[in-house]
Amino acid sequence: MHRMKKLLYLFFLANPLFSSAQIADSAKREVKLQGAINFRDVGGYATKDGRHVKWGKIYRSAELNNLTDADLLKLQQLGIARVDDFRGPFEVKLAPDKIPLNATRIDLPSGSEHIGDSGSSFSKTMMKGNGDLLMLNFYSNTAPFANRYRPVFKELLQLNPDSALLFHCTAGKDRTGIAAALILYALGVNEKTIMRDYLATNYYRTSENEKAISGMVKNYGMDEATARKMTEAKEKYLNATFVSIIRQYGTVNHYLESVMGLDKKMLQKLRTLYLN
């Protein structure tokens, strides 16, 4: 019980409101593209031991189906060689990726198989107006994580030193946000910074979220409050992931070792590769 209270305290320290400094820090890492939003570098964050995550090695984004030729050239120049897609088959069919020349795309749809399927229980729950409950359940369900995120860590450990990796989903918020949080935690970034990176999605998707909310209300008859819950990144959502991990595995480090394959040797290698 004491450990759980401590965990909740640590992960609720982050302020859900953006200060100007937080926005500036987030904005400088944005990769501006014509055909994609919420595309940013995960580098630059300080770790607990005084090092920093390397810039230009790990990127996160929303969907990539509208990338222009200029965008693709920019991603090629960034050295992006691996593109991990967390979306399910319905999402991929609706908005197929465009990827830079010579990059390899990897499908990692675990847990997303029925997202976008109007007949699925996920969609039915969403339409009933249980937005908050749906999101909390989604974040706390760690069962799909092994097949979704373990390959990402494996790729990071094997990536060519001159290359970069990009991971994404549809909005670049939930599945992508969890991936970024686990990677940053493994690299030794503190919880407050991890939460700020996660919440930055609300800043980058401000106008897009309003469009999405209007579309949900107009096209699906969803009430605005439920639609807003579906589009926002909230502290309690990401907290639900870490609380679930702690309940099952005792510590996040034990989870990273037993489920993500990051024993002490692999964790040290990961930090050597991606910290300076």
Residue ranges and their predicted role:
Residues 21-165, 179-276:
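Cys-dependent protein tyrosine phosphatase-like superfamily
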Residues 170-176:
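Ser/Thr-glycine-rich phosphate-binding loops at phosphate-binding pockets of nucleotides
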